[in-house]
Amino acid sequence: MKKNYTAIILDIQHSRKFDDDKRLYIQDKLFSIIKFINDYCNKELVKKFEFSAGDSIQALFYNISDAFSCYCFIKNLFYPYQIRCGIGYGKINQKFMDQNYVSTNMLDGEAYHYAISALHDCKLEKYDFLIYSSNEERDYFVNQIMSTVELLNLDHTYKQADIFNLFNLLYPLEIRRGGMNIKEISTFIINKLKENVLSYKFEDFTSSGSIKLILGEVTYNYQERKKQLHKLFDQRFSTKINSVCAVLLNVSRQNIEKMRVVGKFDEIRKLECLVLEYIRNEYEHEKKD
């Protein structure tokens, strides 16, 4: 039986609204992210991310769950700008695979056709995310949950959105290491947080104390979650993260806790965890049958 792969195509939302300078800045931001992700997820990628056309990037994953968690991470790294995502799960033309093309632009097959259709419908129906495969029933289940996630995110104020981004980058849905060490990962996250969080002033963000705090938090998360490789660490954010964010943003812990509850941070994370587990159980089990 032919193996299924996962094609993922992302593009920048509303890119035509930006002037040339802003658009160049945003494209540079996305370029730095995919360069990082290609190292961060190098064991999960069949073909690395690359620009395919205009503001679009695409890649090919072995597993659909890895593609989904990678999308969630890229979305948070790219914040406050938005991306659309089409994921396609299916076969790849084996003749193209046998040629061992380096570029994903040279590949073809139903996984790519599904991903292209999913991205097209995202634009048409104004969704952020859609997943398509040969099983419409399970696709519908995933897409409905992710639609709920989008609606919950839309309810966030600017400050809530900034704090939620901080939560997600310090405590991603899943961990990866690739060929990178924790310090490299932490440094990249620190640089992105300085770009992303706009509602608060990070006077001491580049101080040794703040960097040590973030490095310590990322290290702790990675070490603890490494013990449960490819398993969910928790369906809630850690309670410790409230204090970490309060120190970084120079606000009270109670303020962070209130934002967390009102913004339904844990509810959103639980829904994303549900999607991740469902994808593993309902899509990837086919390979074992």
Residue positions per predicted region:
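Regulatory and interdomain segments flanking nucleotide-handling catalytic cores
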Residues: 1-289
